[in-house]
Amino acid sequence: LSHVLIIDSDAVVFTPDYLSTYWEMRHVADVVCGSIQSPTVCPYGCELRYKYEEAARNVRQMVYREAHPYAHLSTFNILFHRDVFDQTQFDERCTEYGYEDALMGLMLEKLGLTVEHIDNPLIHDGMDPNAVYLQKVETALRTLHHLGEPMHSASPLVRLVRRIKRWHITPLCRLAYRLTRPLLYRQLMSHNPSMTCLKCYKLGFYLMLDKK
């Protein structure tokens, strides 16, 4: 067995040449990363996850992924050389949802292993209901808080939290979150959730974790 192909349980193969594309590209790098495509129609009640995935489309463009091969690695759809997979594995600290992909990217970069991004998509068919997805977001933030370095330095959210601390406005931001959390929650549970509200919710939630 020379290679290990990882496909997420929520992924759907929809192109006839999916496997042959990976086979032809298997020697171009230590790790070959395919792409993710959202469903064409948003399932009712799953607008939050759907809009998040749509907003993430820009960083999933091939030109961006090629420019940042480690930062936007995704194990949703990925081919490892067997020796590389045995050498890296997944971080054992990630026992819950979130950040295993980011940590894998950091590990591959640290080891000097090569990553090639290709246009070989799978459809992400696991659109969670709004409340379920927000619970996953909270779990991922707890995971991030627990991980420490080097993940913290690589996280835009943690870097923002550090700036807030330097500006000495952390108590004010926590108060704003406590006051607006019910409104943010209702907005995120609506059929037209705002990604700006999601960012504010994540920042406030993380600041409260940091308080503990």
Walk through the language-model features, giving the residues of each:
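Short beta-strand-to-loop acidic/aromatic patch adjacent to the donor-nucleotide binding site
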Residues: 2-12
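Conserved donor NDP-sugar-binding/catalytic core segment of glycosyltransferases
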Residues: 12-47
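Short, flexible, basic/aromatic active-site loop/helix in glycosyltransferases
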Residues: 51-70
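Glycine/small-residue-rich pyrophosphate-binding loop that anchors the diphosphate of NDP-sugar donors
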Residues: 69-78, 100
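Conserved nucleotide-sugar donor-binding
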Residues: 74-88
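Acidic donor-binding loop at a coil-to-helix junction in glycosyltransferase catalytic cores
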Residues: 96-104
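Active-site donor/metal-binding and catalytic loop motifs
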Residues: 111-136, 140-148
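Non-catalytic, C-terminal membrane-associated alpha-helical segments of glycosyltransferases
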Residues: 139, 156-212
